Amino acid sequence: MDGSFVQHSVRVLQELNKQREKGQYCDATLDVGGLVFKAHWSVLACCSHFFQSLYGDGSGGSVVLPAGFAEIFGLLLDFFYTGHLALTSGNRDQVLLAARELRVPEAVELCQSFKPKTSVGQAAGGQSGLGPPASQNVNSHVKEPAGLEEEEVSRTLGLVPRDQEPRGSHSPQRPQLHSPAQSEGPSSLCGKLKQALKPCPLEDKKPEDCKVPPRPLEAEGAQLQGGSNEWEVVVQVEDDGDGDYMSEPEAVLTRRKSNVIRKPCAAEPALSAGSLAAEPAENRKGTAVPVECPTCHKKFLSKYYLKVHNRKHTGEKPFECPKCGKCYFRKENLLEHEARNCMNRSEQVFTCSVCQETFRRRMELRVHMVSHTGEMPYKCSSCSQQFMQKKDLQSHMIKLHGAPKPHACPTCAKCFLSRTELQLHEAFKHRGEKLFVCEECGHRASSRNGLQMHIKAKHRNERPHVCEFCSHAFTQKANLNMHLRTHTGEKPFQCHLCGKTFRTQASLDKHNRTHTGERPFSCEFCEQRFTEKGPLLRHVASRHQEGRPHFCQICGKTFKAVEQLRVHVRRHKGVRKFECTECGYKFTRQAHLRRHMEIHDRVENYNPRQRKLRNLIIEDEKMVVVALQPPAELEVGSAEVIVESLAQGGLASQLPGQRLCAEESFTGPGVLEPSLIITAAVPEDCDT
């Protein structure tokens, strides 16, 4: 190999090591007992088979390693970048365990070749000091340790010859089972190592002969102790994932983890002396069942990650950055945030290339650049509107130009703007799940935003957004903006088929069903279908439910539908929010107002006090109505009296007959001119 190429590779590794120390271009975050290490995935994958298998799906992220590796993981990371491994007699066992767990064969070979520096008397002695203690020999590898001195360990792996062995060493021999007294010699010692590392038969396995470390399913995950080799790997995503949530697509990754941690039936070195022996027996036998979330039924590898996952249902974010105040569900996310040095990012400024003006946010710079270019980056292809962000253009195309929403529900074909909205829709509408639970009252919400609105409105009584027209308060500004449209008359949602506009997207969706003929809400008792859910509920309550389950607590009146009860309660409260624009009369229901407006369409100058006469049609101002009174009480004025229509009721059918008096003269003092009068005989028992 050419020497210049070797120097080039060394220089590249040196530059990568410098980048690692500065935290530049590092796409891997390693959390080891609270210590965060930055590294390059490519270097980790080249040096460790474990990291290579973990990155096999091509997704980076954060890896959480056990706290017991915190003291020696920096040595292994330095070995990845420099080839130097600083071993001592105190850290050799821990480095060997970590190298085996992470599957770093070169580091394992160096640890096996390492031998602490001993005195001449001990080197030539017989049974007094040959080799390390038996507890360490049992944990050694099959290969016999070579005579590598302590001060010679900090060298590159390429300079360590494989054929160098101490002068007194021999090839490993099969141990003599009938002579246990000869176990002090080097060859018999290596034979014991081989015998200890031979796989145990299934029928001969005993806890004292073959100690198998527990699988990671038993790991509590909260704080891993130094004496346990249980550990878990968590690939962290942007939105504070659920940690060790076990789903079907992750089965391959789970198998990889189990293959990494499962070891042959042999006694492995512990992170601290006697830790494996002190381990509870119930943790050494069998495999624990994954814990399940009682709310959404997701399964997790440990109780710790279930506890973290429950914070998503409650909205709790206990880990707050002391510098910028940002909160996180998990401590690992906070550590990663702090490793990125949030204050330096907040102090970053963006400079305009034209006028050199500086801005604290990139979005402010984009808005400023419009003053120079006169154009926004995103333009609508159907109209002349422009937008600063792509999502605003997408929302504009959907609302005004009828563009389809990108994420469709496979069950009901309803579409959504984001994948998160689709997932919440599937969980709430099709699976009946309300994943977010209020800790104070147990109220369940289908979204985190809905839970926060509930807490603000019910428990904190926070309504900071007040309408400037009617002083009505809201918990969210979006609700206030929607309410303001009732005052301003704004209707931003337009039907792309007929051009009709609406205040809300929900109203537009209901209107679109008039074009498509869609009736998605079907009755489970009959074949009738509805365009909205409200009419379906009223139909079921009135047609298919027996009794009147909803009753008023004020007067005790019962109703079939809860909506009828709500309207009735408004009467007790004096609420009549549907007002007639012609006469000012108010109603409790909009249907009553629509029926009332029909009177104004056929009768002019309608007075609400004349509601009892609404069945009579008056055609002329000179006309007056003659009520059905006894003839003795009938008063006639100086105008023509024409009764066009009598009130429809039981009285009209009881009239015996009518008498028409035409061109007759009246001498009464109250009659000034001849009139045409229609009279009727009224029974005496009528008290109308």
Swiss-Prot record:
<feature type="zinc finger region" description="C2H2-type 8">
    <location>
        <begin position="521"/>
        <end position="544"/>
    </location>
</feature>
<feature type="zinc finger region" description="C2H2-type 10">
    <location>
        <begin position="578"/>
        <end position="600"/>
    </location>
</feature>
<keyword id="KW-0158">Chromosome</keyword>
<dbReference type="GO" id="GO:0051252">
    <property type="term" value="P:regulation of RNA metabolic process"/>
</dbReference>
<comment type="similarity">
    <text>Belongs to the krueppel C2H2-type zinc-finger protein family.</text>
</comment>
<keyword id="KW-0010">Activator</keyword>
<keyword id="KW-0779">Telomere</keyword>
<feature type="binding site">
    <location>
        <position position="296"/>
    </location>
    <ligand>
        <name>Zn(2+) 1</name>
    </ligand>
</feature>
<feature type="binding site">
    <location>
        <position position="313"/>
    </location>
    <ligand>
        <name>Zn(2+) 1</name>
    </ligand>
</feature>
<feature type="binding site">
    <location>
        <position position="596"/>
    </location>
    <ligand>
        <name>Zn(2+) 6</name>
    </ligand>
</feature>
<dbReference type="Pfam" id="PF00096">
    <property type="entry name" value="zf-C2H2"/>
</dbReference>
<keyword id="KW-0597">Phosphoprotein</keyword>
<feature type="modified residue" description="Phosphoserine">
    <location>
        <position position="179"/>
    </location>
</feature>
<feature type="binding site">
    <location>
        <position position="372"/>
    </location>
    <ligand>
        <name>Zn(2+) 3</name>
    </ligand>
</feature>
<dbReference type="GO" id="GO:0003723">
    <property type="term" value="F:RNA binding"/>
</dbReference>
<dbReference type="InterPro" id="IPR013087">
    <property type="entry name" value="Znf_C2H2_type"/>
</dbReference>
<dbReference type="GO" id="GO:0003700">
    <property type="term" value="F:DNA-binding transcription factor activity"/>
</dbReference>
<dbReference type="GO" id="GO:0005634">
    <property type="term" value="C:nucleus"/>
</dbReference>
<keyword id="KW-0479">Metal-binding</keyword>
<dbReference type="GO" id="GO:0003691">
    <property type="term" value="F:double-stranded telomeric DNA binding"/>
</dbReference>
<dbReference type="GO" id="GO:0000978">
    <property type="term" value="F:RNA polymerase II cis-regulatory region sequence-specific DNA binding"/>
</dbReference>
<feature type="binding site">
    <location>
        <position position="293"/>
    </location>
    <ligand>
        <name>Zn(2+) 1</name>
    </ligand>
</feature>
<feature type="zinc finger region" description="C2H2-type 1">
    <location>
        <begin position="291"/>
        <end position="313"/>
    </location>
</feature>
<feature type="binding site">
    <location>
        <position position="600"/>
    </location>
    <ligand>
        <name>Zn(2+) 6</name>
    </ligand>
</feature>
<dbReference type="GO" id="GO:0000781">
    <property type="term" value="C:chromosome, telomeric region"/>
</dbReference>
<protein>
    <recommendedName>
        <fullName>Zinc finger and BTB domain-containing protein 48</fullName>
    </recommendedName>
</protein>
<keyword id="KW-0863">Zinc-finger</keyword>
<feature type="zinc finger region" description="C2H2-type 2">
    <location>
        <begin position="350"/>
        <end position="372"/>
    </location>
</feature>
<feature type="binding site">
    <location>
        <position position="337"/>
    </location>
    <ligand>
        <name>Zn(2+) 2</name>
    </ligand>
</feature>
<dbReference type="InterPro" id="IPR036236">
    <property type="entry name" value="Znf_C2H2_sf"/>
</dbReference>
<feature type="zinc finger region" description="C2H2-type 3">
    <location>
        <begin position="378"/>
        <end position="401"/>
    </location>
</feature>
<feature type="zinc finger region" description="C2H2-type 4">
    <location>
        <begin position="407"/>
        <end position="430"/>
    </location>
</feature>
<feature type="region of interest" description="Disordered">
    <location>
        <begin position="119"/>
        <end position="140"/>
    </location>
</feature>
<feature type="binding site">
    <location>
        <position position="596"/>
    </location>
    <ligand>
        <name>Zn(2+) 5</name>
    </ligand>
</feature>
<feature type="binding site">
    <location>
        <position position="580"/>
    </location>
    <ligand>
        <name>Zn(2+) 6</name>
    </ligand>
</feature>
<feature type="region of interest" description="Disordered">
    <location>
        <begin position="161"/>
        <end position="192"/>
    </location>
</feature>
<dbReference type="GO" id="GO:0042802">
    <property type="term" value="F:identical protein binding"/>
</dbReference>
<keyword id="KW-0804">Transcription</keyword>
<dbReference type="InterPro" id="IPR000210">
    <property type="entry name" value="BTB/POZ_dom"/>
</dbReference>
<feature type="binding site">
    <location>
        <position position="555"/>
    </location>
    <ligand>
        <name>Zn(2+) 5</name>
    </ligand>
</feature>
<dbReference type="GO" id="GO:0006357">
    <property type="term" value="P:regulation of transcription by RNA polymerase II"/>
</dbReference>
<feature type="modified residue" description="Phosphoserine">
    <location>
        <position position="171"/>
    </location>
</feature>
